[in-house]
């Protein structure tokens, strides 16, 4: 992978998640079920959070000048809009759509998720400004959008895609999955009784990789010690989502477990493999 893309990958992964989020999730686990409707839309809370980004722009003259050229949606003048950041500079471009979540009764959780989305967009825009400053040359393209992959009466899973291109391309997918009835942001470890899921899921993914390569010679996964970065195990907080039919899907970024041409890779984990490890059948069946 291109060294610059590797740096962008690490910096994006290091975007700090609000400290309050873990506490909020724990609180939400104890809340009584409530009925509500959740939609994706820029919220007043998210708009208020734009102050954070405005401060960043005011500190950086190049950023301020660039932001003044961004198409504005709504009544926010010369400031970031949470729908889209779009700019072209020389032969580089950025197009970042920032999602905002609304409809949760737990506003602390809702605001923390939106703050996380905002920080991610800040980091992407910061990288764009730094990489396209006057003393630097090169073509950079950053594109980010989002989509709802699961929307049932109980669950909402949202995928945010980030594609960075500079000589070569690198694609990431990030998910959040929410229990809409109970206002809970689900984490991978929260679905299981203990840490045994890490080993069990990792082993199943390896078996799926081997089977796929056996059936299709064009597919390659990094599994052997001869590979530069062989896949050993998933992370405790590995990227995941839950499908509409309540199946667990584990996701890997481009280059994470396979060559770039394989793109973002996903593995659906058979429920029978993990059923005895689950805390219950509410989410995974």
UniProtKB/Swiss-Prot annotation:
Compartments, as annotated in UniProt: Cell membrane
Q: Which residues lie on this side of the membrane: Cytoplasmic?
A: 1-37
Q: Which UniProt keywords apply?
A: Cell membrane, Membrane, Transmembrane, Transmembrane helix
InterPro entries of this UniProt entry?
DUF3298, PdaC, PdaC/RsiV-like_sf
Q: What GO cellular-component annotations does this UniProt entry give? A: plasma membrane
Q: Which residues lie on this side of the membrane: Extracellular?
A: 59-285
Its topology with respect to the membrane? Single-pass membrane protein
The record's Pfam families line, in alphabetical order, gives: DUF3298 (PF11738), PdaC (PF13739)
* Primary location group: membrane
Q: Where are the transmembrane segments?
A: 38-58
The UniProt similarity line reads: Belongs to the RsiV family.
Assembly description = Interacts (via N-terminal region) with SigV.
Biological role stated in the UniProt entry = Anti-sigma factor for SigV. Negatively regulates SigV activity through direct interaction.
Name recorded for this polypeptide: Anti-sigma-V factor RsiV
The organism's lineage is:
Bacteria, Bacillati, Bacillota, Bacilli, Bacillales
């Amino acid at each position: 992978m291109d060294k610059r893309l590797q740096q962008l990958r690490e910096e994006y992964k290091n975007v700090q998640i609000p400290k309050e989020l873990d506490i909020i999730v724990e609180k939400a686990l104890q809340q009584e079920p409530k009925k509500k409707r959740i939609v994706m839309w820029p919220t007043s809370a998210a708009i208020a959070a734009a102050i954070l980004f405005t401060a960043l722009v005011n500190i950086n003259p190049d950023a301020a000048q660039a932001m003044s050229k961004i198409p504005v949606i709504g009544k926010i003048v010369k400031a970031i809009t949470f729908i889209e950041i779009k700019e072209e500079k020389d032969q580089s471009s950025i197009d970042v759509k920032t999602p905002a979540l609304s409809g949760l009764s737990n506003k602390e959780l809702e605001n923390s998720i939106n703050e996380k989305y905002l920080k991610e967009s800040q980091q992407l825009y910061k990288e764009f400004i730094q990489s396209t400053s006057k003393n630097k040359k090169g073509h950079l393209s950053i594109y980010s959008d989002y989509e709802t992959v699961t929307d049932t009466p109980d669950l909402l899973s949202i995928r945010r895609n980030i594609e960075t291109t500079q000589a070569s391309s690198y694609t990431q997918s990030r998910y959040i999955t929410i229990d809409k009835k109970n206002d809970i942001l689900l984490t991978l470890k929260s679905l299981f009784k203990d840490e045994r899921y890490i080993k069990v899921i990792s082993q199943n993914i390896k078996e799926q990789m081997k089977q796929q390569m056996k059936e299709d010679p064009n597919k390659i996964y990094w599994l052997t010690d001869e590979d530069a970065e062989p896949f050993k195990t998933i992370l405790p907080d590995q990227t995941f989502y839950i499908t509409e039919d309540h199946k667990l899907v584990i996701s890997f970024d481009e280059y994470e477990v396979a060559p770039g041409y394989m793109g973002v890779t996903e593995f659906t984990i058979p429920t029978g493999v993990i059923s005895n490890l689950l805390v219950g059948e509410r989410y995974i069946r």
